[in-house]
Amino acid sequence: MSSDLEIARAAKLRPIATVADEAKIPAEALHSYGLHVAKIDTSLLPKKDRPAKLVLVTAINPTPAGEGKTTTTIGLGDALRRLGKACVIALREPSLGPCFGTKGGATGGGYAQIVPMERINLHLTGDFHAITSAHNLLAALIDNHLYWGAEPKIDSRKVAWRRVLDMNDRALRQIVVGLGGGGNGYPRETGFDITAASEIMAIFCLSKDLADLQQRLAQIIVAQDVNKQPVRADALQAVGAMTVLLKDALMPNLVQTLEGTPTFVHGGPFANIAHGCNSVAATLAAMQLGDYVVTEAGFGADLGAEKFLDIKCRQAGIAPSAAVIVATARALKSHGGVAPADLNKENLDALKAGLANLGRHIANVKKFGLPVVVAINHFLSDTEAEQELIAHTCRDEYGVEAIDCRHWAAGGKGALALAEKVIALVEGGTAQFKMLYEDTLPLIEKMRRIAQEIYGAADISLDAKAKKQLADIEAQGFGHFPVCVAKTQYSFAADPKLLGAPTGHIVPIREVRLSAGAGFVVMICGDIMTMPGLSRQPAAWKIGLDAQGNIEGLF
């Protein structure tokens, strides 16, 4: 079979104006970026009395074998359109870090892709650049404020705002700025995070409109002053310029699938170190256009789905009508202890052991009151016995249906059975959405509930630094915020080596960060880093141009 890149290049894309017109997007709302990409002015969209039904796609804990969550999201959207439903897909934008690192892009695969694939994976309309620029403008204004000794007097030892870059670069995790003499400012320790972990990214993705964005930017707490009082971005007169940088970027990007399904690609926070959901602006816009909106949350349901349901839905006032959990026989065998080299071999004992991971994710999503269906993303190495074991276990032990899906090879046609089941779940009206915790629960108890109810942990632990940070945040009046957990994506535990469905473990919290503008508190667990590093053999080694100027090695 052709590679993803070859399939994407062979596709006959429709003009984005045609895609927009079929989605009932007014021509005056369309800001074209070439023939196949546009931004949408959401203020000009028609308002529906009954917004579309929202379907959340999530997955088991990821493995090197891959699950195909984005591919399934796209295949499901195409299948719903084949069944006559007006469907819009809402996805996150890819980050350059994973594209040049290990994970790769985020445009799906096979015949379930969004296009133009190369452009989406590399810059798209420049939103990440705008977010990076706005974030680093605030950082520059902080150091300029320190240099001139302006009021309020910032304590240079208490600056919390780091810089960001949309790249995996471990050398920038801890740095010293202001070296080289008094003309270069005050030396102090700081560091870089990846743009996807930026609070500006979170604010960007949680803002409903420009007014909401500007209000959130003003609330960012960047430091303490010499009297131990919080210093906000508005005190540095930063908000107006930051908003200007983000104004056009806040308009959602419209692209299409290989089958022409309209797709919003907007915002890109990671789910392991941020909240892992596409923008509220894009999701709300999609819900005004279609009968169904299919969206995804990053990594496994323990991270992305929990944050989608406890953070995004809480702040945006939305609720899904059903959830799809993606798994593969290969990934389940990996959770059952099979080495990567042996994943193509049938191993029913390992598969049975690995199914415990899927079972916990199913139980967790049900705790939010959502009906669930499992999508088994089919691989050529899957055997009939493996498919039967998955189906029987899901039905008999977990009380859900598992559907064999072949959208990678067949596009929307390969996900028709999944789409029919999703329609049945949605139209059955059984969803009774509820969040895992109330706003009034103390922050430490919110974290404990997530750890025990979602991760299967015995308890949590906080070191002295984290305890003080948590106490300070509570004292400042932010105890009502939801919790955003930064944790390894590979396990329910903070240890990435604990596969399957571990129980009885302790979740160690080493740092607590306040994101006052985004409206949540970040709990950093274990060894997770907010600036990733490149792998021993980064994907960047294989990427280049051929003699005709075409990109090679992207996927």
UniProtKB/Swiss-Prot annotation:
Binding locations of ATP: T63, P64, A65, G66, E67, G68, K69, T70
Biological process, per Gene Ontology: tetrahydrofolate interconversion
Record keywords, A-Z: ATP-binding, Ligase, Nucleotide-binding, One-carbon metabolism
Pathway(s) the chain acts in: One-carbon metabolism; tetrahydrofolate interconversion
InterPro entries registered for this protein in UniProt: Formate_THF_ligase, Formate_THF_ligase_CS, P-loop_NTPase
Major enzyme class: ligase
Signal peptide: none
The EC number(s) this enzyme carries: 6.3.4.3
GO terms assigned for molecular function: ATP binding; formate-tetrahydrofolate ligase activity
One Pfam family recorded for the sequence: FTHFS
Reaction catalysed by this enzyme: (6S)-5,6,7,8-tetrahydrofolate + formate + ATP = (6R)-10-formyltetrahydrofolate + ADP + phosphate
Assigned protein family: Belongs to the formate--tetrahydrofolate ligase family.
Name recorded for this polypeptide: Formate--tetrahydrofolate ligase
Protein source organism: Beijerinckia indica subsp. indica (strain ATCC 9039 / DSM 1715 / NCIMB 8712)
Lineage of origin: Bacteria, Pseudomonadati, Pseudomonadota, Alphaproteobacteria, Hyphomicrobiales
